[in-house]
Every structure is written in C-alpha cells, then in structure tokens.
Amino acid sequence: MGLDGLAAYLDAYLENIVREGKSEHTVAAYRRDLQELLALLEEMPSANPSNCTRGDFVQALRRLSGRGLGERTLARKLSSWRQYCVWLVKRGLMHADPTADIKPPKQPERVPKALPQEWLNRMLDLPVDGGDPLAVRDHALFELMYGSGLRVSEIHGLNADDVYLDEAWVHVIGKGRKQRQVPLVGKSVEALKNYLPLRQTASDGKALFTGRNGTRLSQRQIQKRLAQWAAQNGDGRHVSPHMMRHSYAGHLLQASRDIRAVQELLGHSSLSTTQIYTKLDFDHIARLYDEAHPRAKRQDE
C-alpha cells in the first residue's frame, strides 16, 4: 500500500477505535501520530511510491529521532503506526504489516514517583473548614485519589450514583470504557458523607464533583486544586494526581504483597504495567500497614 492508501483509510480507522471505546485523548494522539507519519512519508523519496516499505517506516522513525524526540515518544509513535497497519491487514487492505519487525527504541525503566506514607497521612488529616463547601469537596476528592487510586480521568467522570457509601465501593469506568468496582476506605466514605450534603447540584444532574456553578470539574481543575492544596499546606513539593495514584499502588502492594489484586484495583489490563511498582523503595516507610491501606482505619481505633 502506498501513501495515498494510508491516507484514504485514516478516518475510517479513527472512527473504528472510537467505536471500540478509546478516549478522546487517545484518538487525538493516534490522529496526530498518523498524520505526522503521512507527512514524513510524503517528504521522503521512495523507490516505489505506490508501496510503502519497511525501510520507509524505519527512515521516518530515524527522522523523528533526529529531531530529538525521546525513546518513549518514539516507541509510542511506532505503536500507533503498527496498530494502524495491523488494522489494514486484518481488513485485507494491506498485504503485510511493514512495521512488524521494526524494534522500538529501548526504553529506560522508570520507577513512578510516590509520596511518603507519613506525609500523605499528615496532609489528609489536616483540619477541614466544614463551612467551606469547596474545602469539604476538595478533601473528599483527595481522600478518594489516595484511598482508591483512581486516575484523574476516572475521578472527572464519576457521577453521584457511581458511589455506594453503605457498601463502601465506587463504580469506575476506566480506559477503553472498561468497568470495575473499587473499594472505598473508611476515610473516603467519611469525607464523601461530609461532602454530598454540600454538593452543588450538577448542571447535568449527574456529576459527583462540581464547581460553584454546578458544572463538572475538569481534569485540569482537579490537577490545579491538588497542586494548590499541596503548595499551601505542604513543604513545597509538587503533587499530581499521578503521584497520588502511584502512592496508592506502591503502598498497597508493599502492604498486601498481592500484585494481582493491585492490578485489578488499578484497572491495569497487563500485569507488566503493575509490576513496576514492585521496584518502589520508600525510605519513609518504617513498617508495613496493619491493614491493606492505612486510611481504612477509623479515627477511634
């Protein structure tokens, strides 16, 4: 298949992955990667313009590498190209996948950053102004981040009826529209019970976390509120939703030693994604948890 063919089926491919449940961000990333590929192939002289070969894709990857792109970025772009080619082959539109044996750049293993257990407990146990609905909301939001390890996109998408306080669990729609049930620790249940009576009614009638005007908090707003909270009350360290999730995963894995259970709780489709947390080494942890999560303990214990 040549450049014209690759361009002709691009929209159909993107429509297909939308139907498969890929998020808007994922679809947009695929679109950028594939449009960039088409532009690279168009720039390059080819011995056979009607048939893009393995060498053409290798050359495109080298050009991106020459622009200073990192190994992880290059590997992601190659993955986008490969998934498109596989889709074309499965539908009989391409004879063979020209990217099949192209090796992605070797990626350095990177251990996720996590926060010390004692620091998180101290921060989350700070007094909350019960007369300030936004402070109560934020406290519930942060307890949920660490207590259940949700992605910022998952917290953003939560509806009020996704939370079952009596049963202490939350219904989560994760990547690829995959659904899972995640337990709520005692501190999260307590914080949500304090927040729900003060919650600004959602303009869509559904959103769990809303702003003053009732609109659903955006992912960016959630990130900003967390960063501001940490800056105002902490020791100046940067805190992100990813770090809260990594802390949840690492602390829980160290306490439970059950990597399969942690995989399910995090919503990882592959165990290899979860295994990176086995390499976390927290200097600030003096002992393992008495329970699977420290926030599960009630105040009177």
UniProtKB/Swiss-Prot annotation:
UniProt-listed GO biological process terms: cell division; chromosome segregation; DNA recombination; DNA transposition; resolution of DNA recombination intermediates
Gene: xerC
Stretches assigned to the Core-binding (CB) domain: 1-89
Record localization: Cytoplasm
CDD domains: INT_XerDC_C
Principal subcellular localisation of the protein: cytoplasm
Function: Site-specific tyrosine recombinase, which acts by catalyzing the cutting and rejoining of the recombining DNA molecules. The XerC-XerD complex is essential to convert dimers of the bacterial chromosome into monomers to permit their segregation at cell division. It also contributes to the segregational stability of plasmids.
Domain Tyr recombinase: 110-290
UniProt keyword Cell division present: yes
Gene3D superfamilies per record: 1.10.150.130, Intergrase catalytic core
Descriptive protein name: Tyrosine recombinase XerC
